[in-house]
Amino acid sequence: MAPPVIEEYLGSRPSMERCVLLRAQRRNMTRVLNFDRKLFLSLVVKSRRRFFKKLGGSEKEIAARIEEYFSRQRRLEKLGQILTVLELQSVIVSEFTRTLGSLTTPTPAINAAVRRVDAPRARALASRALNSYAVLPPPEEAAPMARHKHSDLVEVVKRLVKEHLRRHNKRCVCYGSYALHLLNPEIEYGDIDMVQTNARPFLINLAFLIYFVTGRQTVLLRVPYLKNYVVLQDEEGGHILDSFNVRQATLRALPTLLVDNIYVLHPFVQLMAMLKMFSQTDRIRDLADNFDKARARMETLLAFALEELGEAPADGRTPLPCAFLPPEGGASRVLEADARALDCGFARAVVFLDEPALVQTLLDMGVQDDEIVDFESVSNSAFLVRDNTLFTYFSNTVLMDGDAVHDLSRRGVSAHIVMFLLLTRHPAAEGAVRSMLGSLVSDARPVTSVVERERKTGTHGVIDIAKNVITH
């Protein structure tokens, strides 16, 4: 005889085989059956009023969608689809009130710190720095950077995400264009970039909030070559929101700045990330079409740095000397950087262009897990300091000037090393940033060849509400 909770959840008596397979899910079924849908409906309706304005349906339509989804399992035949619906219902039951429902409660009185930078102060330096990136010949065929198409739901979601960043600022950190907008309101921004400790349940609940309020179907994708990255798309593949998930310990360790009660990734770290990014060929070519946008972002970061550290020195100690190590059995994809100028506790950095090669090297060295520092998607690499050497991974292309590593890639590798110092709060970190400020402009020597970045492979994970599918 089937346990009563299984019969009640399915709305029918299951076969003995199905009963055995579902027995382990009795606790989740009980929680779903006991879920207060009237209270949930009131939270969804409040969310519609606060964030969706005129976009949402009537309360009657919302109630019908909620009732349909919480009884959907009764109309399904495939066990896999039933388990998918139960898993997603369980996420709503356990997480919605904490992640999204709480955003509808009155805002507590907060004296939020506001920080604005004098961006024009750094405009000339930013322009000279970016002009020195004109080092690539025009492509034979126009190949603009692949950009995702934005959904018409982005503007609605932005209002909600801003409130999420303020209310839950112990669980999420903002970076990118919106973080810079908080420092310089002249910065335009599209979607809002963030890392958080509960990215998957947050986006699942957001997907259901959109569905219950508007009837719009959305899909969540997990991209295999980006660490713990989840993106929410509309029914036509339009980009709504993405987020990186990080461990709580990682989030607590990140250097941040509190602006308008939102924690933003420290501008020094974001500046290093930007300099790393410009070792990438598609980013350099994109400057030709989006120079003003890039300059506005760089001058904002530079203005913050100049205010904190003083004027840039006339001659910085970076970019660090870099060269490829002699190959072992093939073309070398390992760089060595001379880090002595940073006076930071290690004399050199061994920089792998292939992450599996770094992992294998650490295994061969017998490294223990607690010796490795990893800031997940923020640094996009683990770090180890041993025997006066930093071991790490660089995920961008390396530009060459003849047989030598080009200044721009030396700067990118140097920025990666300085980012490590910043993330670990090393005493030499701020001095290293100041040195970078004094070496942002180079002579724009042409790039003669490119060492490609590592190509990562894998299959996308999908959560499709309409099709009742979860693939990992």
Swiss-Prot record:
What UniProt keywords are attached to this protein's entry? ATP-binding, mRNA processing, Nucleotide-binding, Transcription, Transferase
Query: Which GO terms of the molecular function aspect are on file?
Result: ATP binding; poly(A) RNA polymerase activity
Spell out the InterPro entries in the cross-references: PolyA_pol_cat_Poxvir, PolyA_pol_cat_sf, PolyA_pol_nucTrfase_Poxvir, PolyA_pol_nucTrfase_sf_Poxvir, Poxvirus_polyA_pol_cat_C, Poxvirus_polyA_pol_cat_N, Poxvirus_polyA_pol_cat_N_sf
Q: Where is the active site?
A: 191, 193
Q: What class of enzyme is it?
A: transferase
Reaction catalyzed: RNA(n) + ATP = RNA(n)-3'-adenine ribonucleotide + diphosphate
Q: Which domain of life is it from?
A: Viruses
Pfam families from the entry?
Pox_polyA_pol, Pox_polyA_pol_C, Pox_polyA_pol_N
User: Which Enzyme Commission numbers does its entry carry?
Assistant: 2.7.7.19
A single Gene Ontology biological process assigned to it is: mRNA processing
Family label = Belongs to the poxviridae poly(A) polymerase catalytic subunit family.
- Oligomeric form and interacting partners: Heterodimer of a large (catalytic) subunit and a small (regulatory) subunit.
Q: Report the function annotation for this chain.
A: Polymerase that creates the 3'-poly(A) tail of mRNA's.
Q: What is this protein called?
A: Poly(A) polymerase catalytic subunit
